[in-house]
């Protein structure tokens, strides 16, 4: 998915590369068997994030993924002197800051089904032609939603989404192939639409306005309530009885609204510094290629041979947990080298890594899931 190019941070394509890794690229752990987490445990600065706070067990008990703190320090020693700007994204398809409620509705509905856009069996991406251009991956999803709205389909109304049929949804997402995971997306829209219809007059902007203008605020923050009221956003995994929180899509949707609307005074968020990275497919690849993370031989082989890694498996949890852990450490090390007026927050590191590595031909892990 092209989260920064167009609708910015929304989405992540599960593209399958046919690339065969070269031996001179980052090697697996030299010690045979399992990976260790870190030789000497370091922990990111406390930013008040329940997501980071939940990672301790996953990091400390890791078997197959390791984070190299010394490499983080090394990378930070030069990355700190890059601009690393706060992203300012443009709203798509003529959406305007002049109508922030429509922007909120569009972004959050799209975010709710912003999952795999590649057919896992055929390795074919979802694509569509719209408005004189060719779109693929998540951009094709957004184009389809705009096309439906232009044709009078009330796709941003929860009352419609709660009852949308499979044929209707298939028509909305008419493209080169059937929308991947169409049935799962249908179930998500029914769930989200039902909550919106019953509690928020069918609109996501009513939900957003009813929340505290914070990510976390004693249960009334935007993320607090998204994961509580909309189960599809409750992106958590259990590892040996420990709950590990990731919250990729809820954080991503709110981050995009903040990045597009806050400068115009159309979206207030008082605690963006509590955001983590967005644990997806591409940022782990960036960390791997930079030598910040390393994998056991078994995991490395599974990824490089395009084996499906099950959702909620130890492998998947460790990959995502180390993504969040190492990017938080990197932000901290970068800030040690930057002046007070140029301090960054973790999503700026995420943006830097995703932008530079989303077109890499190095294989990423493959997990069929509605969570990212």
PLM regions with names:
Residues 31-247, 294, 301, 357-372:
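Phosphate/adenylate-binding glycine loop and adjacent helical scaffold
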Residues 1, 21-39:
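C-terminal segment of N-terminal export signals and the immediately downstream linker at the start
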Residues 5-28:
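N-terminal export signals
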Residues 14-18, 200, 291, 334:
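A generic secondary-structure signal for well-formed alpha-helical elements
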Residues 250-254:
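Amphipathic alpha-helical elements of HEAT/ARM-like alpha-solenoid repeat scaffolds that form extended
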Residues 255-372:
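Accessory, usually C-terminal, subdomains that scaffold auxiliary metal cofactors
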């Amino acid at each position: 998915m092209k989260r920064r190019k167009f609708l910015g941070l929304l989405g992540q394509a599960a593209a399958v590369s046919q690339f065969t890794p070269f031996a001179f690229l980052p090697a697996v752990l030299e010690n045979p068997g399992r990976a260790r987490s870190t030789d000497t445990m370091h922990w990111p600065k406390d930013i008040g994030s329940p997501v980071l706070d939940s990672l301790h067990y996953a990091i400390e008990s890791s078997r197959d993924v390791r984070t190299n703190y010394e490499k983080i320090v090394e990378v930070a020693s030069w990355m700190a002197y890059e601009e690393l700007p706060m992203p300012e994204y443009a709203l798509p398809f003529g959406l305007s800051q002049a109508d922030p409620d429509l922007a909120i509705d569009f972004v959050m509905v799209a975010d709710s089904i912003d999952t795999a856009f590649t057919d896992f069996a055929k390795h074919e991406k979802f694509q569509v032609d719209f408005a004189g251009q060719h779109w693929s991956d998540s951009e094709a999803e957004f184009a389809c939603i705009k096309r439906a709205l232009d044709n009078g389909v009330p796709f941003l109304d929860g009352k419609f989404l709660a009852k949308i049929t499979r044929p209707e949804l298939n028509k909305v997402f008419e493209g080169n192939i059937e929308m991947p995971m169409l049935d799962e997306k249908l179930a998500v829209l029914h769930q989200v639409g039902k909550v919106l219809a019953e509690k928020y007059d069918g609109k996501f902007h009513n939900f957003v306005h009813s929340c505290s203008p914070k990510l976390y605020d004693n249960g009334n923050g935007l993320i607090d309530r998204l994961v509580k009221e909309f189960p599809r956003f409750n992106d958590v995994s259990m590892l040996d009885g420990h709950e590990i929180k990731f919250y990729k899509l809820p954080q991503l949707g709110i981050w995009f609204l903040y990045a597009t609307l806050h400068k115009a005074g159309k979206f207030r968020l008082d605690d963006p510094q509590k955001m983590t990275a967005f644990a997806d497919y591409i940022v782990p690849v960036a960390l791997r290629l930079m030598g910040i993370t390393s994998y056991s031989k078994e995991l490395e082989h599974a990824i490089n041979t395009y084996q499906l890694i099950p959702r909620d498996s130890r492998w998947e949890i460790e990959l995502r947990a180390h993504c969040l852990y190492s990017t938080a450490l990197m932000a901290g090390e970068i800030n040690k080298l930057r002046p007070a007026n140029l301090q960054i927050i973790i999503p700026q590191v995420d943006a830097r890594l995703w932008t530079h590595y989303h077109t890499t031909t190095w294989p990423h892990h493959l997990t069929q899931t509605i969570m990212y």
